């Protein structure tokens, strides 16, 4: 477990104390990425909910996912190395809530989105992410550098007569080559 993740788990467990919860389930992309120092729980950025979630109890932390996602989360995201125990369920079963309940016991469970009979605590979780850690600041600097480099590479490849959609495609390609997700890219030409 990294010092960054340790600090974040302390924040979450402090929230458990303040809210009288025994566990919290993080399903949103942003919260999953925050709690894992950048791991991706999603297949598509078109949804706010990922293919895996994190359950944090007072003394353990788990990743809950279907059996298809588990190998990727282990090999690519290295979540077990970060201190998360991966618990799976068959891909064809909707067992996320039941598995969370099994792992957390009979106590109160919060969730960052309305889900099952868990208490919705998304509004209380978001402020935990507002102050950046030194590691996050460094990652943002690196992301800024990588984004600038992608924009420069794409801009250098633009030729007179290129369609706006072709320019967007070039930039998208440069971003994706570096594993950078984007929400929107615009291009304008005269």
PLM features: residue spans?
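Internal metal/ion-chelating core segments
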Residues: 133-190
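A composition/biophysics-driven feature that prefers long, compositionally simple stretches
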Residues: 1-152, 164-165
